[in-house]
Amino acid sequence: TICYSGGCAVGASNISEGRGTPHPFLTYGAPYIDMDEFYEALLPWVDREKLLIRKKAFTPSERKYIGEICYGIELMPLCDTYDFIPLSMRILKAAADLYPNDFELVKAADGQMHISRVTGSHEMERVLEGKKDLDSLLTEWDAQSKVFAEATEQYRIYR
């Protein structure tokens, strides 16, 4: 479950988030991805004490790419406190940078990019277009998250 929120963000693109596989939201890929290249691009961002990553070819049985071989990665969290959102944004950025002719964001019925709905703003779109730095956005989100956590501390049942 810790990977679900980040997985939904990846699902806002044409990358399979592993639905219809034994490990949905832990498996990511697409037919156009070179899994060696993709793995190498993501490896520097993985804290291997908290998360394992490996290359993975898979065939989804539902949603995107049903019955097609997808190439990408599989993740295995080693703890239940890993913040998966930054890595999920790096998955999107790596795909956008490595495969600009193939990578696409998914539009909602109203024409708005689904990634903007999932993340709450158009900032990730700007990152994927090369108009904003991903590290800057992640720093902003971290600061906003801390402010929210402080403001809601007294109302939380589970800590």
Regions found by a protein language model. Give the residues of each.
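C-terminal and late-domain segments of enzyme folds
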Residues: 1-47
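Conserved functional hotspot residues or short segments at active or partner-binding sites
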Residues: 29-139
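Charge-biased, low-complexity intrinsically disordered regions
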Residues: 1-16, 29, 84, 126-151, ...
